[in-house]
Amino acid sequence: MIQNNKKEDRATRFKRVAQRRTDHILNSLRILGNCSNKSTYQYSEEEVAKIFRAIEEQLRITKTRFRSSRPRKFTL
């Protein structure tokens, strides 16, 4: 029973921390979107592509961390 409570505590902590961090990321993306105002900022399509490549690459890495919690085994 104690182990079950620990798991619940870990699950509750995950939800609390993940929700706060996700909200922070989404807010940061909204703020980044403010840079799209061409009357205030000047930028090239290449610069925009570079920004989104970096974001998409980090998103891919983070998704992978959630999908695979065990090390991959080498096979020939």
Please place each PLM-identified region on the residue numbering:
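N-terminal intrinsically disordered, cationic/polar leader segments
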Residues: 2-76
